[in-house]
Amino acid sequence: MAAALLARASGPVRRALRPRAWRQLHTIYQSVELPETHQMLLQTCRDFAEKELFPIAAQVDKEHLFPAAQVKKMGGLGLLAMDVPEELGGAGLDYLAYAIAMEEISRGCASTGVIMSVNNSLYLGPILKFGSKEQKQKWVTPFTSGDKIGCFALSEPGNGSDAGAASTTARAEGDSWVLNGTKAWITNAWEASAAVVFASTDRALQNKGISAFLVPMPTPGLTLGKKEDKLGIRGSSTANLIFEDCRIPKDSILGEPGMGFKIAMQTLDMGRIGIASQALGIAQTALDCAVNYAENRMAFGAPLTKLQVIQFKLADMALALESARLLTWRAAMLKDNKKPFIKEAAMAKLAASEAATAISHQAIQILGGMGYVTEMPAERHYRDARITEIYEGTSEIQRLVIAGHLLRSYRS
């Protein structure tokens, strides 16, 4: 898969690299520049987004259209399984590479970005970390090429941020587990071929009684709720998963019984880097839109960019974007180097999501009336940005995570 990405590059960067360089990756960078491998990846993903995603983004949003052909092409490039080892069909890259690719794909189409994020971080991530060899062969390899994608079922109608309060149950019965309950707000639900599902196997133990399961889709006893009509990221389906005596094999449990809450929290820690990167892509394309418009819109005999008030807005937008990008890349590098990254991932997700909302808001202000109509993409960027402050941990949850780690460091 890494070779597929390599083949898309051209010029001196490609000639200077060999496939082996993809496996060397990075340690801690002493330079402000990205390694050549990552620069090449960035350009490859940018070219793909400009050719394949920018032209369809408005249609995807308007028609709630799942971009199946583009997702398939992304699978062929390794973008749906970026840190999955090559022997399992993945690209075998690192999390910094994933963050870079996620930003560029999301810059082209935010809906496609979240489809990519869920498959990489939330579906494949926990199986890679906690799955057995047999589970990886069954539940990872078929989900790397774009033929199949997965989803992650944690939230419920009665709990979102309170992830430990699962009311969905799984009881052991012979050689099976039987699931009952409803999971809510499941991204990719209507297109997914499998789900990582969290259910209580012992309610008396509260969050220590939650377990994780691998569930094929479709399967008897599992039905899908209606597709939610959302404000943004409308090309990615969101729906409930409804379990009614849904029977799955005993070996479908991921990890050990009672490990589900741990698996969920560690998965979300990784996923926040992906969502931060999605937010960066939305913020970048909103800034691009604002600058392009302001350079060409004449007012008082000159382009808008000659006005100090517009320059100040653009400067603030760029500052927020670049600051969030550095936080995101740092979190990814810490993870790649097996250093603690939970606080940094929360900071990245918080900074990037709030930057995306603020930047897309200011982009509309710069465009004025043109920012409020669908003729321009600014209003779509604003709608797409808003969810990044909500899913995979709200901004309030990120602040709790950051404060908790900060205070523990002072008290230790």
UniProtKB/Swiss-Prot annotation:
GO cellular component: mitochondrial matrix
The EC number(s) this enzyme carries: 1.3.8.1
N6-acetyllysine: residues bearing it: 51, 72, 129, 208, 262, 306
GO molecular function, one term: short-chain fatty acyl-CoA dehydrogenase activity
Active site: 392 (proton acceptor)
UniProt-annotated binding residues for FAD: 152-161, 185-187, 297, 308, 365-369, 394-396
Similarity comment: family membership: Belongs to the acyl-CoA dehydrogenase family.
InterPro entries: Acyl-CoA_DH_CS, Acyl-CoA_Oxase/DH_mid-dom, Acyl-CoA_Oxase/DH_mid-dom_sf, AcylCo_DH-like_C, AcylCo_DH/oxidase_C, AcylCoA_DH/ox_N, AcylCoA_DH/ox_N_sf, AcylCoA_DH/oxidase_NM_dom_sf
Annotated function: Short-chain specific acyl-CoA dehydrogenase is one of the acyl-CoA dehydrogenases that catalyze the first step of mitochondrial fatty acid beta-oxidation, an aerobic process breaking down fatty acids into acetyl-CoA and allowing the production of energy from fats.
Residue numbers carrying N6-succinyllysine: 51, 129, 262, 306
Gene: ACADS
Coiled-coil spans in chain: none
Top-rank taxon, per record: Eukaryota
Assembly mode: Homotetramer.
Name this protein carries in UniProt: Short-chain specific acyl-CoA dehydrogenase, mitochondrial
Residues engaged in binding substrate: 161, 269-272, 393
GO BP terms in the entry: butyrate catabolic process; fatty acid beta-oxidation using acyl-CoA dehydrogenase
